[in-house]
Amino acid sequence: MTNIRKNHPLMKIINHSFIDLPAPSNISSWWNFGSLLGLCLTIQIVTGLFLAMHYTSDTSTAFSSVAHICRDVNYGWIIRYIHANGASMFFFCLFIHIGRGLYYGSFTLLDTWNIGIMLLIAVMATAFMGYVLPWGQMSFWGATVITNLLSAIPYIGTNLVEWVWGGFSVDKATLTRFFAFHFILPFIVAALVVIHLIFLHETGSNNPSGISSDSDKIPFHPYYSLKDLLGVVFLLATLSILVLFSPDLLGDPDNYTPANPLVTPPHIKPEWYFLFAYAILRSIPNKLGGVLALAMSILILALIPHLHTAKQRSMMFRPLSQCLFWVLVANLLTLTWIGGQPVENPFIIIGQTASILYFLTILILMPLTSLFENKLLKW
């Protein structure tokens, strides 16, 4: 068996990636979220495939096909809710995974980090298009509002929006192409995940101390495979409780009303995992400025390795940077809350303040604090 594992062309790759992989001996539970993201992606692809067997991407039947899945298909309701809440679990793990990368300085592995940013954008695009498919009120108006942002691009904006829509408004052509892209993107994400892992295994994993762990490695299996299994149990338990006891907790009641272009919902908002970016978009009164801020709220991650001024890689021994990191986390939670509130005072001013603080923290405060810590340590 050992010989097959180490000599067979395919088994050899799996062995070097998941069994005999040398891993740092001190990585904490924050490193569990990578494997949990792999599990989430698998769950989403499997449940999505079964949903696609019964879903019809036509404006006249999309809403009723989702109702048909829930009422008439064997266990259709649970497949639908695992898929919907699985997306929430996916983003929850994704945000923690990125946060861990920021805290422990994993962004210094440039190739891995940049592929990770591409993965984030691809997953966000997939989730957005998936939200449009049930063709409820929030699906229709969310698609209209977000795609309409492209019209802010000078010269080509209007033509670009109509090209994305496939007409002069969000309609049948839009729904059909969104379904096609929503189906293919998870497989592109899976391919990017493989590239992400290839780059990670080129350099080896980071660890909480941020220093080289070449002198102290242990095999991935059984140590970290068992450790990851604990995370899997927690994730599946949380997802099961959410699906079986409160499946609509994170959804919007407006999406149980069929899409109607003549009636605008009182408050258009995306799913909770986009609310921080939506709050940044709304905080700027100018349309083009808002779109640029929205794009930068994600793309700013690509600048972080170049803004890293500290002599130490990890924040483990940098208390001032730790404080700033948790200020950033609190700020993102504030933005998420604001994104779900109506556009009125005091929410407008809170959103604007939090948006300024978000960019200020990443672009100015964190690099300056790192330089100050270098001075304190006489480096």
Swiss-Prot record:
Membrane topology: Multi-pass membrane protein
Pfam family, one: Cytochrome_B
Record field: transmembrane: 33-53, 77-98, 113-133, 178-198, 226-246, 288-308, 320-340, 347-367
This protein's UniProt keywords: Electron transport, Heme, Iron, Membrane, Metal-binding, Mitochondrion, Mitochondrion inner membrane, Respiratory chain, Transmembrane, Transmembrane helix, Transport, Ubiquinone
Annotated a ubiquinone binding sites: H201
The keyword Iron belongs to this UniProt entry's keyword annotation: yes
Gene Ontology CC annotations of this record: mitochondrial inner membrane; respiratory chain complex III
Swiss-Prot/TrEMBL cofactor(s): heme b
Annotated compartments: Mitochondrion inner membrane
Molecular-function GO terms, alphabetical: metal ion binding; ubiquinol-cytochrome-c reductase activity
InterPro entries in the cross-refs: Cyt_b/b6_C, Cyt_b/b6_C_sf, Cyt_b/b6_N, Cytb/b6-like_sf, Cytochrome_b, Cytochrome_b_C_euk/bac, Cytochrome_b_N_euk/bac, Di-haem_cyt_TM
Main location: mitochondrion
Cofactor note: Binds 2 heme b groups non-covalently.
Matching PROSITE patterns: CYTB_CTER, CYTB_NTER
Binding site for heme b b562: H83, H182
Residues where heme b b566 binds: H97, H196
One BP term from GO: mitochondrial electron transport, ubiquinol to cytochrome c
Note: Heme 1 (or BL or b562) is low-potential and absorbs at about 562 nm, and heme 2 (or BH or b566) is high-potential and absorbs at about 566 nm.
PANTHER family according to UniProt: CYTOCHROME B
Summary of subunit composition and partner proteins: The cytochrome bc1 complex contains 11 subunits: 3 respiratory subunits (MT-CYB, CYC1 and UQCRFS1), 2 core proteins (UQCRC1 and UQCRC2) and 6 low-molecular weight proteins (UQCRH/QCR6, UQCRB/QCR7, UQCRQ/QCR8, UQCR10/QCR9, UQCR11/QCR10 and a cleavage product of UQCRFS1). This cytochrome bc1 complex then forms a dimer.
Function summary: Component of the ubiquinol-cytochrome c reductase complex (complex III or cytochrome b-c1 complex) that is part of the mitochondrial respiratory chain. The b-c1 complex mediates electron transfer from ubiquinol to cytochrome c. Contributes to the generation of a proton gradient across the mitochondrial membrane that is then used for ATP synthesis.
Family stated for the protein in its record: Belongs to the cytochrome b family.
UniProt name for this protein: Cytochrome b
The organism of origin for this protein: Nycticebus coucang (Slow loris)
